[in-house]
Amino acid sequence: MCWSFHLFFKAHKARVGARTSFLTEMERGSRDHHRDHRDHREHRETREPPTLAFHMKSWKTINKSLKAFAKLLKENTTVTFTPQPSIIIQSAKNHLVQKLTIQAECLFLSDTDRFLTKTINNHIPLFESFMNIISNPEVTKMYIQHDSDLYTRVLVTASDTCTQASVPCVHGQEVVRDTGRSPLRIDLDHSTVSDVLKWLSPVTKTKRSGKSDALMAHIIVQVNPPTIKFVTEMNELEFSNSNKVIFYDVKNMRFNLSAKNLQQALSMCAVIKTSCSLRTVAAKDCKLILTSKSTLLTVEAFLTQEQLKEESRFERMGKQDDGKGDRSHKNDDGSALASKQEMQYKITNYMVPAKNGTAGSSLFNEKEDSESDDSMHFDYSSNPNPKRQRCVV
């Protein structure tokens, strides 16, 4: 019996030891789990927030372009950082939105999953503006960090300084985007864009007290033959299909734009020295879209039409020339005079506002029926206009 009790006690001791060992392993595993969780939480709290930075080698190749853009993008300008990554600088004014996109090839993002889209104002008190930072050749490093939904941290390093600022975010700011659908596409090479800018320069520099903002530029696109005309009160410029002006999709269209807005949009496209694509979006307010792209930068300008309020001097000049022609040719053959007046009507009627304030709609129907090359020119019956130009390259 003593032997049986000894075996029972030994078995009970083994069971208690096994249970104690099992509980010890559970406690040890629980402690390890909590320690790992605490270490992970501390690591997450102490690790760097997601950071967006420039590849400095690529940035140096576009520094001069960014310096030019800094002069063009000043007022009403916002900067948006996206996790693609990309940086979108957008400026808005009346009837014109300009957009500069710095592509992913020029940027580095440490954590695409945790970096959220953020928008700030271009104006940063400590640095004057964001555009001034990225166009400054003395900058050696620049970081944009996301560690709060309310602000963006900007860190800038130059040769002898290191500065950071917390910039408040702008909420509710929309980025204008191209829908990609257009019935019109015309590509102008860089030299053609430069020619149009030179042609616009005298118009936009004209000083008229209180009327400088009302200077208009009309863009006329015609199908047969494919041509694009730039028309102002002072002169006109015309291009036909060539290796410098390529018509991909053509539709009879007319745009009434601010001359200054058109000049600024073309100036944006001219900075990166590539071809400029003219497209349109068929909407309530018809937009003309100008786009230029390089490997690292994309420029877009969205222009909406201006309302023609009154008859322009260029239109009045055409009417006066009609009157002079009638008086100077009153002894000519009647059929020849009627033919000349009909031709003049074809040329100038699209610029004369209709009674309801909109432009006449009969130009393109008549233009398509006419195969005469003369109908593409302004044929003044008095002295010819020396400022009229026709470009066929």
Curated annotation (Swiss-Prot):
Spell out the Gene3D superfamilies in the cross-references. 3.70.10.10
Q: Where is this region: Disordered?
A: 25-50, 311-339, 355-393
Is 4Fe-4S given among the entry's keywords? Answer: no
Q: Does the keyword Thylakoid apply?
A: no
Ranges of compositional bias, category Basic and acidic residues:
311-333
Intrachain S-S bonds = none
What are the entry keywords?
Answer: DNA replication, DNA-binding, Phosphoprotein
Q: Where is the composition biased (Basic residues)?
A: 31-41
A Pfam family assignment? Herpes_PAP
Q: Which GO terms describe its molecular function?
A: DNA binding; DNA polymerase processivity factor activity
- Domain of life of the native organism: Viruses
- Role summary: Accessory subunit of the DNA polymerase that acts to increase the processivity of polymerization.
Question: What family does this belong to?
Answer: Belongs to the herpesviridae polymerase accessory protein family.
> What is the protein name stated in its UniProt record?
DNA polymerase processivity factor
The species this protein was found in? Human herpesvirus 6A (strain Uganda-1102)
Gene name for this UniProt entry? U27
